[in-house]
A protein has these predicted regions:
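Short terminal alpha-helical segments
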Residues: 1-51, 117-120, 124-127
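Short, charged, amphipathic alpha-helical segments
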Residues: 40-53, 69-73, 103-110
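Charged, low-complexity interaction regions
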Residues: 32-45, 63-66, 93-104, 129
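Amphipathic alpha-helical binding modules
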Residues: 74-132
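Phosphate-binding glycine-rich loops and adjacent basic patches that engage nucleotide phosphates
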Residues: 8-17, 69-79
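Short, solvent-exposed, charged loop/turn and helix-capping segments
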Residues: 55-75
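Extended amphipathic alpha-helical scaffold segments
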Residues: 24, 28-31, 49, 56, ...
Length: 132
């Protein structure tokens, strides 16, 4: 039922998931750009690439299962929970020898995280609306 309701909304997959894919790719790109400034960056990159594979699969199949839809909500919580040490919300870099580079990097990372969070929230908001 949820899938049918969401499918009936014009271009749910095409618009929102393309934007989600682009935001994940942008976040991966900016983390890779500054990964030398944080030792555990590769773990974040791996997790985001796994997520990107799932997003691409949804785009390729143009189909969302009920499980995928309900998992989006918990995914958004885990990515942006400030109490979780390895959440994307807590990701930042630091170079004690170059504070200007640190500020520039964290500004770029912050913009990419905000874009990713905004579209993920938009999608989960639609999912939660249809689950009520």
């Amino acid at each position: 039922m949820i899938c049918e309701e969401l499918k009936s909304r014009k271009n749910f997959v095409e618009e929102d998931f393309i934007e989600l894919r682009d935001s994940v790719e942008g976040l991966i790109s900016v983390i890779e750009k500054y990964k030398d400034m944080r030792k555990d960056s590769d773990g974040y990159i791996r997790e985001l690439k796994k997520f990107l594979e799932e997003v691409n699969l949804v785009l390729e199949e143009k189909n969302l299962t009920k499980k995928e839809l309900t998992n989006l909500h918990s995914l958004s919580e885990s990515y942006f929970d400030s109490r979780i040490d390895n959440s994307i919300y807590s990701y930042y870099v630091y170079d004690k020898n170059n504070l200007e580079k640190t500020h520039q990097a964290n500004d770029e990372i912050g913009i990419a995280k905000k874009r990713f969070g905004k579209i993920l929230y938009k999608i989960t908001e639609k999912v939660m609306y249809h689950m009520i």
